[in-house]
Amino acid sequence: MAITRFAPSPTGYLHIGGLRTSLYSYLWARKTGGEFRLRIEDTDLARNSEEAMKAIIDAFDWVGLNYDGEVFYQSKRTDIYKQYIDKLLESGNAYKCYMSKEELDALRAAQEAAKQTPRYDGTWRPEPGKELPPVPAGVEPVIRIKAPTTGTIEFDDGVKGHMKFDANQVDDYVIARSNGMPTYNFVVAIDDALMGMTDVIRGDDHLSNTPKQIVVYNALGFKVPKFYHVPMINNPEGKKLSKRDGAMDVMDYKRLGYLPEALLNFLVRLGWSNGDQEIFSMKEMLELFDPSNINKSASSYNGEKLLWLNSEYIKAVSNERLIEELKFFDLDLSNYPKKNEILDLAKQRAQTLVELKKSITDIIDIPTSYEESGVKKFIKEDTKELLEKYLLLLESNKNSLDSVEKIEEFTKPFINDNGLKFPQLFQPIRIALTGGTQAPSVYDIIFILGYDEIFKRINEALKRNFQNT
């Protein structure tokens, strides 16, 4: 039974890398019958944003990754952190350091000049027989943890395998600032231990933090969880993903017309696979996912793949679901007479809900202008006479407008009898009915709109001579 978590900082939006990590954590917890927790790491009070915090919660609600229990906020747990800092001080596993910023800057400069790795030199670290400097007046100390100075810090990573770090690389890092505020690596270790985390799945940019956190676990006698460090998502050129490439707010994907299932399907495949399978239901993800099978190398973001997946999900979900989704884009088809027919038609061509809306409104909205290039190419001197004759044909076949097949049945002889090619009739009709030349089949449009609406739109186009006013 795995207990996992996702722990974002509310200093910016939730991007897809974070969502992928949370998805992996969610799947593993649910698959094993464990718990998936959400923790907000908001100790950086100066950079916290209420808007970002809300966006994180909204994103989880939208994609349907339901977390267990209450949301943990680190800013509300400072008393707990202080208790453990005091415990470390009492046990001798942490100590007070009174070095000033100027002294630390001078130390760093000297080490860099000597081509040494900058690190704390242990001036205030208590050792048997060592005499510490006198405590300066009026200086509030920081608290440093006593890291091991010899040996190695090792752990088995579920993705990267056995990891080994020289202990002297960790340094006696600060676990509490001079104002008493605890630091990131300390509070993460405390929270993961107290929340009972068994498995920590996170980006491999956190790999260097892990030995620092293990020092805290060991100093307090906590059990070290299983770590899985997931490689980054790169752009197609193998570089860091930028906003232009797709590293944007998760909620931007909603605004761009992606379905949450498609986005999750896309993300689960960015670093994990099951043979050549591309489309996964949530049920299949839960059955098949195992974090030990996450790829060791970075994945590549493919926007075309995401669009393809989204188009497949748009075709697959129910029309009732699409009607609800389209309300977000200010289109309500609830009371439209042929809502199912128009959705069945439009969703075959749409890659996003934005495109779906446009495909629908191109048909149901009366055109306010006509595509100039289409008018120039397809509207001829005899077009008016041709469309008037076709309207008479529609009128005489009003009772046959209830199926696409019947409309096709009486239209094809009309085209042949008048010596026409299909575009000579259909493109002027498309322009008159939708304003453009890229709409779906004319038979489908006629079926959806019905005689009265077709009569009105064609006559309006003829009245305006297909000109924009």
From Swiss-Prot:
Alphabetized Pfam families for the sequence: Anticodon_2, tRNA-synt_1c
Residues that bind ATP: 243
Main localisation: cytoplasm
Transmembrane helix recorded as keyword: no
Domain of life: Bacteria
Cellular compartment(s): Cytoplasm
CDD domains recorded: GluRS_core (cd00808)
Renumbered ranges of motif 'KMSKS' region: 240-244
Any Gene Ontology CC annotation: cytosol
InterPro entries: aa-tRNA-synth_I_cd-bd, aa-tRNA-synth_I_codon-bd_sub2, aa-tRNA-synth_I_CS, aa_tRNA-synth_I_cd-bd_sf, Glu-tRNA-ligase_bac/mito, Glu/Gln-tRNA-synth, Glu/Gln-tRNA-synth_Ib_cat-dom, GluQ/Sye
Family annotation (PROSITE patterns): AA_TRNA_LIGASE_I
Catalytic reactions on record: tRNA(Glu) + L-glutamate + ATP = L-glutamyl-tRNA(Glu) + AMP + diphosphate
GO biological processes: glutamyl-tRNA aminoacylation
Motif ('HIGH' region): 8-18
Record-listed E.C. numbers: 6.1.1.17
Region span, Disordered: 117-137
Family: Belongs to the class-I aminoacyl-tRNA synthetase family. Glutamate--tRNA ligase type 1 subfamily.
HAMAP family: Glu_tRNA_synth_type1
Protein name: Glutamate--tRNA ligase 1
Organism: Aliarcobacter butzleri (strain RM4018) (Arcobacter butzleri)
Gene (name only): gltX1
